[in-house]
Amino acid sequence: MTWSHYLQLMRIENEDERSFYEIEAAREKWGVRDLSRQYNSYLYERLALSRDKEKVQRLSQEGNVITTSKDVLKDPYVLEFVGLEDKYNYSETDLENRLLDNLQQFLLELGKGFTFVARQKRFSFEEDHFRVDLVFYNRLLKCFVLFDLKIGKLKHQDLGQMQMYVNYYDRYEKTEEENPTIGVLLCNEKNDAMVELTLPEDSNIYASQYKLYLPDKKLLQDKLKEWLQEEGGAEDEI
């Protein structure tokens, strides 16, 4: 890494957080601009909120190690680079177009191992036709990752639709050597209790919110502290 990288890292007060960004910047060969973006979008806190207590502690020691489907998830995803505003009356197609127009930034936000495969991937059953918004492949997990974009609040029907997409890919697209398909619903708003009741515990389908602006760091830190306390952790662990 360059001296500019280390100047950026020196500004991070929390030792665990600084260690995480140093490991990731070196491993992923982030440029200074990439490092700045990941820090300013609070990647550390967002990854921590998507993991159990043990893996939160490992983030500062090993960085973001990808071994399971949950390791590639964030909640929320930060999509400030698309240039849309919450008040703007945009459609799912608008969001999809902006994501693909800024594919390099989107891949950075998605994280390790992702490659783009297709948009609006169509498949049919007799006379019924369906389309998956965005299809990616994760080479570390060796599986397809499907993204469905939802404007507004997530509905239980959306989860059922994604289950069908995942089932299709598992049965007709993936090979025997590949791992089960992951489905991610990106939505403005969601009811976590509804999602938990709708999906089985071993489901490979996830719902994550997206934000069109950089999140508030203190809000994420407070949320992480509260979650760690519920898990039996302590505030000084972050």
Residue ranges and their predicted role:
Residues 1-238:
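Basic, low-complexity intrinsically disordered segments
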